[in-house]
Amino acid sequence: MNFIKTHKKDFIYCCVIVLLAVAALVLGVALASKKSAEEKSYYDKKCEVFAAENANFSRGQIVFIGDSITDGCALDTYYGALDLATYNRGIGGDTTAGVLKRLDSSLVALEPSKVVLLIGINDINGGVKKGEIIDNYDKILKKISESLPNSEVLCVSILPLNDDLESYTGISVAKSTETILAVNPEIEKLAEKYGYGFVDMFSVLADDENRLPKNLSPDGIHLSDAGYRKYSTVIKPMLCD
């Protein structure tokens, strides 16, 4: 009898342990899901902001779309004198795949008359193959041409880098530059394919060694005020027509 009672107690004890473990697991998953929802990525947060802005923004204006170089640009400072409003749809860290994914809400919904597209450097620095970059870029332009047949598009070449970037990231600037120089002509071909404009901003900004001059960048990849001013002196006249 004692033997049976002992085993019965052991069985109950094991059941309690199992139930507690299951409860802890369920609670842990719930908390993790809640934390994940609360800690949305910068990309997701920006996409939500853009979607919310769309209802209040005018159609037929100018949209700049791309990565951190666009995201960090104070458009009113460099393009404020234009007749049309300028909307910034840049997201720091974005890639060609990211832009393609958000085209509808970030661009198409605004029905812009002009689009300035600058994207690709994060793909290159992240090791994305040239073929995939070009394929994504092609899909971006195809989507724009189908959804916004009356919009003018300006495809800006990927910009140069300098060795400051390598010093704090370990990214090989020489290797990235080699890829940039291989990708930019392909972007130009795609722009021509869809009847869009192309700006070789790499050549505008690069020095004799194909590097971004230090006075134009604070960190080897992003633009300083001087960099944005040089950039805008080329882009701005193209948006005045």
Predicted regions and their residues:
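Serine-esterase "nucleophile elbow" of acetyl-processing enzymes
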Residues: G28-S113
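Alpha-helical scaffolding segments of alpha/beta enzyme cores, especially the outer helices
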Residues: D135, K139-K143, A182-K189
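A short helix->loop->beta-strand "cap" motif at the edges of active sites that frequently abuts
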Residues: L148-E152
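N-terminal Sec-pathway targeting helices
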Residues: N2-L20
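Soluble or luminal CAZymes and related metallo-dependent hydrolases
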Residues: Y42-K45, T95-V99, E132-N136, T179-V183, ...
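Cell-envelope and extracellular/periplasmic
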Residues: G90-I91, I119-I124, A206
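Catalytic His-Asp segment of secreted/periplasmic serine-dependent ester chemistry enzymes
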Residues: L161-D241
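Oxyanion-hole/transition-state-stabilizing segment in secreted/luminal serine hydrolases
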Residues: D71-A81, A97-D135, K143, L154, ...
